[in-house]
Design a protein with these regions (language model features):
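Walker A (P-loop) phosphate-binding motif
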Residues: 1-54
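Phosphate/Mg2+-binding loops and adjacent switch elements
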Residues: 35, 43-159
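Conserved beta-strand/loop subsegment of P-loop NTPase cores
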Residues: 110-113, 138-148, 157-185, 205-210, ...
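Short, acidic/turn-prone active-site loops that include or flank metal/cofactor-
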Residues: 115-119, 168-170, 210-216, 258-264
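Short, charged, surface-exposed secondary-structure boundary motifs
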Residues: 119-130, 173-176, 216-219, 263-272
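Redox- and metal-dependent alpha/beta enzyme cores, enriched for Fe-S-associated oxidoreductases
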Residues: 170-219, 271-274
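Short, flexible loop segments at boundaries between secondary-structure elements
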Residues: 212-213, 253-278
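A short, acidic, amphipathic alpha-helical segment used as a generic capping/interface helix at domain edges
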Residues: 216-234, 241-242
Length: 278
């Protein structure tokens, strides 16, 4: 490729490790460095530029969410998507899902894993929880980001790869959640993590509904959730990723808790990003 490629992915099957927040954080950091960054993620067909006004059921919830932070493309062929982004003026391309085993050679490979879940037995499915064996996957990356509490980070200290400990934190929006009666619903990799975040913010979670990752927000489902929230006298609340799947008429009635990646130290990542342009 004629421009630097940053591949971001996870060895863990099933999602929920924090790849999307990492992609957003890297895109924001590159933008702060005055670089025109585009994001490419897997989708159907030829490369398509995503507008924030697109519908999630047509383009996917994660591409639609990322498009709020950087120009975003979907493509069945990630290499074609990267070329389309470069042709459109990208100075650097982040490939969401570019690890492991991508056909696109990356200038910087970033693995993202849950510090709590770890790598299990380190073996690939069906013998273990990973897409490919741990050591093979680590060999494809330049840096490993482990997301989770500090008490869970020590298990990764002996790995032969530069590592950045990080956590997901709610974005400070000025909303005071203390004592707020909420009905929470989430269709993400680990919905329980969202419910725990609300508890940590001081909200009173009087009802909750865990949905499947990327689950369709059908009228019947939303009617049921709204009815349950009303019966409990609670405010409906969900994640950023789920919010983009809501119909426009419902969005004003549902509060959203954005979360952002917070590394313990940005320095090593900033250095690696800067090297892409030297």
């Amino acid at each position: 490729m004629s421009r630097p490629i940053v591949a971001v992915g996870s060895l863990t099957r099933g999602g929920g490790t924090g790849v999307t927040p990492t992609v957003i954080a890297l895109a924001q950091k590159l933008s702060e460095m005055q670089r025109n960054v585009h994001v490419v993620t897997t989708g159907a067909g030829t490369p398509r530029s995503i507008a924030y006004t697109d519908r999630a059921e047509e383009v996917g919830d994660e591409p639609l969410l990322i498009a709020a932070f950087a120009p975003t493309w979907t493509a069945a062929d990630l290499a074609m998507g990267a070329r389309a982004a470069i042709d459109a003026g990208a100075e650097v391309v982040i490939i969401d899902g570019g690890l492991p085993d991508s056909a696109v050679r990356a200038d910087l490979g970033v693995l993202v894993e849950s510090a709590v879940r770890g790598f299990g037995n380190g073996r690939a499915w069906p013998l273990g929880p990973l897409k490919i064996a741990r050591d093979k996957g680590l060999s494809q990356a330049d840096v490993l980001i482990t997301l989770g509490p500090m008490r869970a980070q020590t298990d990764f200290e002996s790995l032969p790869i530069p590592r950045v400990a990080a956590r997901l934190e709610p974005l400070q929006t000025g909303m005071d959640w203390t004592g707020a009666r909420v009905f929470a619903f989430a269709g993400i990799g680990v919905p329980e993590r969202f419910f725990a975040t609300l508890n940590d913010l001081g909200a009173e979670v009087v009802g909750k509904q865990a949905l499947a990752d990327h689950q369709d927000m059908t009228p019947a489902l939303l009617t049921r959730l709204a009815r349950e929230a009303a019966m409990l006298g609670a405010q409906m609340v969900t994640t950023e990723k789920d919010a983009v799947r809501l119909p426009p008429e419902l969005r004003p009635h549902v509060l959203v808790v954005p979360v952002r990646l917070v590394p313990e130290d940005w320095t090593s990542l900033e250095v690696r990003l800067a090297r892409l342009f030297t």
